[in-house]
């Protein structure tokens, strides 16, 4: 999370005052905030939160707010698979940016529950290679793995955006940046929000 201080929220209850860090307070409202690069540690925390919230109430919506530059493909897929595994409906919100692997999480929300805030951006690009080194046979294996990873990302995005693989491959050949409106038109999200949805 960097070196900045995580704010606390103080609540008054009949038993007295109780202090939470803001992320725990959001979790009590069934909100998960993903605001960092995605690595194994971040993925494990998000997965634990998803499983906890499903266990508490498998029918009540879980909201994931995303402001992330992306990150590890395996970490992304661990979160994505858990999102599809749990019974609870999943809504996704892009605030700031959902770049690279984070864009897949945005698109992976339940149909009709994928939102992007008005001035956010979404970026599609090829999964990072990580600057691999090694013998020729090692590099050959790594190249095959990168092709497999790219194919998996394309298949997931095709499922959620309704674009064919060839279109996605061409669009992801270089980084492609979408405004909020363009992300909706492309099928990465369902609606642009400028204000919170009314509670009914």
Curated annotation (Swiss-Prot):
Signal peptide: none
Entries under Pfam families matching the protein: CLP_protease
Main localisation: cytoplasm
UniProt EC number: 3.4.21.92
GO biological process, one term: protein quality control for misfolded or incompletely synthesized proteins
Xref: CDD domains: S14_ClpP_2
Catalytic activity: Hydrolysis of proteins to small peptides in the presence of ATP and magnesium. alpha-casein is the usual test substrate. In the absence of ATP, only oligopeptides shorter than five residues are hydrolyzed (such as succinyl-Leu-Tyr-|-NHMec, and Leu-Tyr-Leu-|-Tyr-Trp, in which cleavage of the -Tyr-|-Leu- and -Tyr-|-Trp bonds also occurs)
The keyword Hydrolase belongs to this UniProt entry's keyword annotation: yes
Record's keyword annotation contains Nucleotide-binding: no
Subcellular location: Cytoplasm
Entry's Gene Ontology cellular component terms: cytoplasm; endopeptidase Clp complex
Regions crossing the membrane: none
Location of the active site: 100
Keywords recorded for this protein, A-Z: Cytoplasm, Hydrolase, Protease, Serine protease
GO molecular function: ATP-dependent peptidase activity; ATPase binding; serine-type endopeptidase activity
Quaternary organization: Fourteen ClpP subunits assemble into 2 heptameric rings which stack back to back to give a disk-like structure with a central cavity, resembling the structure of eukaryotic proteasomes.
Family: Belongs to the peptidase S14 family.
Its biological purpose: Cleaves peptides in various proteins in a process that requires ATP hydrolysis. Has a chymotrypsin-like activity. Plays a major role in the degradation of misfolded proteins.
UniProt name for this protein: ATP-dependent Clp protease proteolytic subunit 2
Organism: Streptomyces avermitilis (strain ATCC 31267 / DSM 46492 / JCM 5070 / NBRC 14893 / NCIMB 12804 / NRRL 8165 / MA-4680)
Lineage, highest ranks first: Bacteria, Bacillati, Actinomycetota, Actinomycetes, Kitasatosporales
């Amino acid at each position: 999370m960097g070196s900045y201080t995580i704010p606390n929220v103080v609540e008054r209850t009949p038993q007295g005052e109780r202090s939470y860090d803001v992320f725990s307070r959001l979790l009590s409202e069934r909100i998960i905030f993903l605001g960092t690069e995605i690595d194994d540690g971040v993925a494990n925390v998000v997965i634990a939160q998803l499983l906890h919230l499903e266990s508490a109430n498998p029918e009540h919506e879980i909201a994931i707010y995303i402001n992330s530059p992306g990150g590890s493909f395996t970490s992304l897929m661990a979160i994505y698979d858990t999102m599809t595994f749990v019974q609870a409906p999943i809504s996704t919100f892009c605030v700031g940016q959902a770049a690279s692997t984070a864009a897949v999480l945005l698109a992976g929300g339940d149909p009709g529950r994928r939102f992007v805030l008005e001035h956010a951006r979404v970026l599609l690009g090829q999964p990072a290679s990580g600057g691999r080194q090694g013998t020729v046979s090692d590099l050959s294996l790594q190249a095959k793995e990168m092709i497999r990873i790219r194919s998996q990302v394309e298949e997931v995005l095709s499922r959620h955006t309704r674009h064919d693989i060839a279109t996605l491959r061409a669009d992801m050949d270089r980084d492609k940046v979408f405004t909020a409106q363009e992300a909706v038109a492309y099928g990465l999200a369902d609606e642009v929000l400028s204000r919170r949805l009314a509670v009914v």
